[in-house]
């Protein structure tokens, strides 16, 4: 039995979500909508990827459909989600345009016949979920939900382990974040955020992020205890979180490592990784974990004040969690 899904927006996340879905036998993508990419271009963009490499399966255009590994996927080019035909057969929609991020806007998919919508971005008003952290809060009456951000997906599992074991009094997060599609290749206008308009390939760019504060939405008692910022760097993929926290309970760095390793092998297996290798960013391209703790990179100032480092493939890891969230809610809804 599979859950039939649709993808709205065939950009970076939309395409990687499709790749990730092909590895999950419980998900079948049956429709893709993107008004800016025609069918032949979809074939090309899915087949070739500068970061994740050439798609190892088969992909072609046939009879007006995108055929991946022999399975046809209906293709549409509607600008308004409510205009996507109800006959597409997709009960669950991954909203990955980056445009429709509120319950009202993403909810337009429901008009077209969808049962549920997962926004692949933070949302101002939709309930946010992080796999491994707060899935138990989902209920079947929720129609539009958010998978939060890639950075929140990296930070929240790590913060959960530390808070559960030692208690977090307060903390600051910095994410050293890979370039994304919204940045400029060369200097250009960028509204009120002047720094964001500087060339992505030539600069380290300080930026705001709500990722740390969003942890308070998925772990409510941490609300107000964490905040953070970002540095956008000239790196095509893989980012890293630097979490500096003050602990309630004194702990050696060895104690902290042991707690994270235990979680990575137990309750958070497949979500939170653990490594003691001498790793760098490219070692995590294509890693499906939400967060990979770097045991050798962290430092402790004293038993109550520590800096923790965790890597994440901000494209592939995040997209894998979108698929996991889809499967989870489908099971709760009785669709799987």
Curated annotation (Swiss-Prot):
PROSITE patterns: GAPDH. D-glyceraldehyde 3-phosphate binds at residues 149-151, 180, 209-210, 232. GO terms for molecular function: glyceraldehyde-3-phosphate dehydrogenase (NAD+) (phosphorylating) activity; NAD binding; NADP binding. Its EC number is 1.2.1.12. The active site is at residue 150. Pathway: Carbohydrate degradation; glycolysis; pyruvate from D-glyceraldehyde 3-phosphate: step 1/5. GO terms for biological process: glucose metabolic process; glycolytic process. The keyword Oxidoreductase applies. Gene3D superfamilies: Dihydrodipicolinate Reductase, domain 2 (3.30.360.10), NAD(P)-binding Rossmann-like Domain (3.40.50.720). It holds the Pfam family Gp_dh_N. NAD(+) binds at residues 12-13, 34, 79, 314. Disulfide bonds: none annotated. Keywords: Cytoplasm, Glycolysis, NAD, Oxidoreductase. InterPro entries: GlycerAld/Erythrose_P_DH, GlycerAld_3-P_DH_AS, GlycerAld_3-P_DH_cat, GlycerAld_3-P_DH_NAD(P)-bd, Glyceraldehyde-3-P_DH_1, NAD(P)-bd_dom_sf. It catalyses: D-glyceraldehyde 3-phosphate + phosphate + NAD(+) = (2R)-3-phospho-glyceroyl phosphate + NADH + H(+). It is an enzyme of class 1 (oxidoreductase). Homotetramer. Its main location: cytoplasm. It is found in: Cytoplasm. The gene is GPD. This is Glyceraldehyde-3-phosphate dehydrogenase. NCBIfam families: GAPDH-I (TIGR01534). The record marks 177 as: Activates thiol group during catalysis. Belongs to the glyceraldehyde-3-phosphate dehydrogenase family. Signal peptide: none annotated. GO terms for cellular component: cytosol.
């Amino acid at each position: 039995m599979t859950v039939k899904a649709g993808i709205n927006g065939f950009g970076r996340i939309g395409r990687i979500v499709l790749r990730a879905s092909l590895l999950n036998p419980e998900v079948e993508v049956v429709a893709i909508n993107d008004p800016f990419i025609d069918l032949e271009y979809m074939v090309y963009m899915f087949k070739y990827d500068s970061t994740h490499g050439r798609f190892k399966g088969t992909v072609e255009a046939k009879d007006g459909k995108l055929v991946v590994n022999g399975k046809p996927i209906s293709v549409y080019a509607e600008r308004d989600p409510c205009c996507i035909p109800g006959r597409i057969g997709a009960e669950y929609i991954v909203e990955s345009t980056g445009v429709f991020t509120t319950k009202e806007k993403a909810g337009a998919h429901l008009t077209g016949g969808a049962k549920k919508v997962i926004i692949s971005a933070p949302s101002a008003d939709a309930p946010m979920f992080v796999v491994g952290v707060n899935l138990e809060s989902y209920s079947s009456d929720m129609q539009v939900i958010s998978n939060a951000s890639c950075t929140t997906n990296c930070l929240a599992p790590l913060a959960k382990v530390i808070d559960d074991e030692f208690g977090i009094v307060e903390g600051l997060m910095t994410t050293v974040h890979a370039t994304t599609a919204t940045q400029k290749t060369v200097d250009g206008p960028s509204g009120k955020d002047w720094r964001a308009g500087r060339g992505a390939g030539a600069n380290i760019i300080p930026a705001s992020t709500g990722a740390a504060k969003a942890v308070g939405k998925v772990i409510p008692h941490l609300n107000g205890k964490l905040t953070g910022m970002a540095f956008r760097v000239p790196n095509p993929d893989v980012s890293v979180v630097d979490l500096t926290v003050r602990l309630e309970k004194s702990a050696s760095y060895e104690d902290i490592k042991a707690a994270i390793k235990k979680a990575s092998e137990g309750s958070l297996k497949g979500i939170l990784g653990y490594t003691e290798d001498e790793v760098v960013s490219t070692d995590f391209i294509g890693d499906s974990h939400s967060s990979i703790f770097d045991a050798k990179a962290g430092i402790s100032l004293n038993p109550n004040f520590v800096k923790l480092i965790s890597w994440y493939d901000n494209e592939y890891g995040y997209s894998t969690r979108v698929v996991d969230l889809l499967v989870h809610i489908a099971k709760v809804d009785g669709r799987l």
